[in-house]
UniProtKB/Swiss-Prot annotation:
Protein name as catalogued: UDP-N-acetylglucosamine--N-acetylmuramyl-(pentapeptide) pyrophosphoryl-undecaprenol N-acetylglucosamine transferase
Chain sites annotated for binding UDP-N-acetyl-alpha-D-glucosamine: T15, G16, G17, N124, R165, S191, Q285
Organism in which the protein naturally occurs: Microcystis aeruginosa (strain NIES-843 / IAM M-2473)
E.C. number(s) listed in UniProt: 2.4.1.227
Chemical reaction(s) catalysed: di-trans,octa-cis-undecaprenyl diphospho-N-acetyl-alpha-D-muramoyl-L-alanyl-D-glutamyl-meso-2,6-diaminopimeloyl-D-alanyl-D-alanine + UDP-N-acetyl-alpha-D-glucosamine = di-trans,octa-cis-undecaprenyl diphospho-[N-acetyl-alpha-D-glucosaminyl-(1->4)]-N-acetyl-alpha-D-muramoyl-L-alanyl-D-glutamyl-meso-2,6-diaminopimeloyl-D-alanyl-D-alanine + UDP + H(+)
Record keywords: Cell cycle, Cell division, Cell inner membrane, Cell membrane, Cell shape, Cell wall biogenesis/degradation, Glycosyltransferase, Membrane, Peptidoglycan synthesis, Transferase
Cell location: Cell inner membrane
GO molecular function: UDP-N-acetyl-D-glucosamine:N-acetylmuramoyl-L-alanyl-D-glutamyl-meso-2,6-diaminopimelyl-D-alanyl-D-alanine-diphosphoundecaprenol 4-beta-N-acetylglucosaminlytransferase activity; undecaprenyldiphospho-muramoylpentapeptide beta-N-acetylglucosaminyltransferase activity
Length: 357
């Protein structure tokens, strides 16, 4: 008799950092029936392919202060556990994969109650609260950074790097009018944008443009001054669908330092200037970026350390030093595993797949 496909529930929600690694894994599991668990009105509504049934439950993260809202959130978390448990039973889910975030806690606990395997992928160098608290409840916590294991004593961990989507592994072309020989800077503030970073870049950009440098600036959707700079070599867009093509073409990136973005930079061997989001939980973007800076694959600066003049001069120094950029690119190539998604898929198969006859 034919093998019955294993049904997998992927719980990933909210930001590109949570969604893109999960999507990369899903691409490597054509033999699985995949269903998706998210939160209403979040990014997964537009990013998750229609081929994966999308279930949503309303949920929030805990507040730091004890109060009425915290109690309401606690009850919503408890309700979410039973909602996920019911979904697992109804849909006959055989295994669970999650990338952390609000949705992960109830999902991990529901999987334990259902006695099915659960794998958590922690992409950040400093593990999140859910990983620290519930990592021991998972069959395995797969890590994006090797050094993260030291923060998770007593947890079963394995390093697989962070998965990237297949297009990052295949040469891509751009539909932008940028000459092949032009020096290209790509500026990215992450899936949520970065107004302060955008302002800094726009103040610095005129000196770069005078040198004939091209700039693709991804501003996000919440920048009121996104259209304030106009130049034939400057392309400003909220987002760009073909990030693989952009990073492959870029001579230099100026970026926040979410784990997925850093992995993409490593896979595409893109030198970078990293400016961590200053309000990230537990300052995790700084510690992610520090790995790249210590490997001499990137320059790392706190946002409050930078001025437009300093950033402008730093970029022009790199522009005039192709040997330095080549060395940074070489170092970046050592910081990620190109077949991470395959390693993670193999891990999940070992933990979950059962023969049906």
């Amino acid at each position: 008799m034919a093998r019955t496909p294993t049904r997998l529930l992927i719980a990933a929600s909210g930001t590109g950092g949570h969604l893109f690694p999960a999507l990369a894994l899903a691409e490597r599991l054509p033999d699985y029936e995949i269903e998706w668990l998210g939160v209403p009105d979040r990014l997964e509504q537009s990013l998750v392919p229609k081929t994966y049934p999308l279930h949503t439950i309303p949920i929030e993260g805990f507040q730091t202060r004890l109060g009425l809202k915290t109690l309401k959130i606690l009850f919503s978390q408890l309700r979410a556990i039973w909602q996920v448990r019911s979904l697992i039973k109804k849909r006959q889910i055989a295994a669970v994969f999650t990338t952390g975030g609000y949705i992960a806690g109830p999902t991990i606990l529901a999987a334990r109650l259902a006695n099915i395997p659960v794998i958590l992928h922690e992409s950040n160098y400093i593990p999140g609260k859910v990983t620290k608290v519930l990592g021991r409840w998972c069959d395995t916590v797969a890590l994006g950074f090797q050094g993260t294991a030291s923060y998770l004593p007593g947890t079963r961990t394995t390093w697989v790097s962070t998965p990237v989507r297949e297009q990052f592994l295949i040469p891509q072309s751009l539909d932008l009018p940028i000459p092949e020989t032009a020096f290209l800077i790509v500026v990215a503030g992450g899936s949520q944008g970065a107004v302060a970073l955008n302002q800094l870049v726009r103040q610095s950009a005129p000196q770069w443009l005078e040198k004939g440098i091209y700039i693709v600036h991804l501003t996000g959707e919440n920048d009121p001054e996104a259209d304030s700079l106009r130049h034939s070599n400057y392309f400003s867009q909220p987002f760009y669908d073909n990030m693989a093509g952009l990073w492959q073409r870029a001579n230099l990136a100026i970026s926040r330092s979410g784990a997925s973005t850093l992995t993409e930079l490593a896979i595409t061997c893109t030198p970078s200037i990293l400016i961590p989001y200053p309000f990230a939980a537990e300052d995790h973007q700084f510690y992610n970026a520090q790995v790249f800076a210590e490997a001499q694959a990137a320059y790392l600066y706190r946002q409050n350390e930078l001025t437009a003049q300093f950033l402008s001069e730093l970029v022009l120094d790199l522009w005039s030093n192709p040997e330095k950029l080549a060395a940074m690119a070489q170092q970046a190539s050592h910081l990620a595993i190109s077949d991470s998604a395959d390693l993670l898929a193999d891990l999940l198969r070992r933990k979950s797949q059962k023969d049906s006859f």
